[in-house]
Amino acid sequence: MILTSNVKLMPGSKVEAVIQISKEFVKAKYNEILKDYSSRLKVKGFRTGRVPFSIIEGKYSDNIRALAIENLIHKSLEEFFESAIYKPLSYAVPKILDEKLEINFDKDFEFTFVYESYPEFEISDISNFKVEIPEVVISDSDIEDELKLLQFENSIIVEDNGSVKVGSIVRVDFVELDDSLNEILATKRQDFVLTVGESDDYYGFGYDIIGMKKDEEKIVEKNYGSDYKFSELANTSKRLKIGVKDIKRRDIPELDDAFAKDVKDSLNTLEDLRDYVRENMLKVVQEKTNSLKLSKLLSGIAEKVNIDVPSSMFEAELKNVINEFSHQNKINITQLQNSSTGLEGVNDVFKENVLNKLKSKLVFQKMVDNDSSEVTELDLENELIKQAQNLKMAPQDVKKFYKERNLFGLLKDEIKRQKVKEKILQDLEEIKLEKVSFRDFVNYKTGE
């Protein structure tokens, strides 16, 4: 139906397109809608389906023309995007630039629109790219720390009839109070669980409830300094009403041969467990090293390439990051968006970090797109077998899961991404830096 289409790239990875549709097609579409009206309209003096077109046009011409224009735009956009060189972002809606569109049967129909597309950029040769990686040292104390974590993971939670202390697992209700000691309902939280001295709660009241007993309630005055971890609370004072509903504690198992056997049946002694822990730590170091190498490579490339990120793509990424932050810190997203940490209140440094990570993702996706290798049936079969082993399921059941949900396309995409990642890491040159401890290395943010 499209007679011609002309496109041009604009700043912000926007594309301006002009679509022209033949006057013959426009007339045919108009007549199609006119006939549909005729088949359904009831006009006094005429049988349904027998109303003359002239009468219908005289009364409903504007409606018919508006429907025709709407239909022409919708269908032509579908056809345009099926073969578009610059693919549109799925979450960005095309914007029609023409203030007023009209049908003239003596002329071809034309309209102009703008949409945001996937950023266009090229990646230069990376064969000489080098990344700096610290040398990781696994000490005896690192192994002991991992054993303590295992003890913690294998502990059980039991009721505690005493008072709240450091390490207590406490379930509380809390709410902010105004100057008249009235509850500010938007801040009310119920059944909030924290571990005193360990949990990073929003208001930072963990140590303020030490000594409280079950069913006890108290009002806490909190003053936040200029360097408080949540900037929206910095230099403010809050009055909180906190009620303790439940107190529990962890029962930690002894570190002995029996514990080693409980962790893994094939382990017989505590020394066997230490060796097992060291092997797992080495695997973690390798995985983290690969993540760090890839992250440094992608960010290094992104710094050298001009990537014009569309505003809607950045906003979508920013919202995802804020939602993830809300989930991790157990903050109500509505409360978060209403505060200064909402999209408008996010500081420039935070936005810049989000933008840089987004550019790294785009660079990696470009490398995947540029890679000519294909995912074979053998690759797919091996991945299904691996997943079946990890999930302790039969391979045919895993295959059935993907087939029923039509997810094989996504699985193939993920397999290719993994293959490209392995190829990049295999060829990437590594420069060793200073020695660091296992814990410091694991806690290092890769930015991936």
From Swiss-Prot:
EC number: 5.2.1.8
Catalytic activity: [protein]-peptidylproline (omega=180) = [protein]-peptidylproline (omega=0)
Biological processes annotated in GO: cell division; protein folding; protein transport
Residue intervals of the PPIase FKBP-type domain: 167-253
Subcellular localization(s) per the UniProt record: Cytoplasm
Keywords in alphabetical order: Cell cycle, Cell division, Chaperone, Cytoplasm, Isomerase, Rotamase
Class of this enzyme: isomerase
Pfam families xrefs: Trigger_C, Trigger_N
UniProt GO cellular component terms: cytoplasm
Claim: Phosphoprotein is one of the keywords in the record: no
Physiological role: Involved in protein export. Acts as a chaperone by maintaining the newly synthesized protein in an open conformation. Functions as a peptidyl-prolyl cis-trans isomerase.
Protein name listed in UniProt: Trigger factor
Gene name of the encoded protein: tig
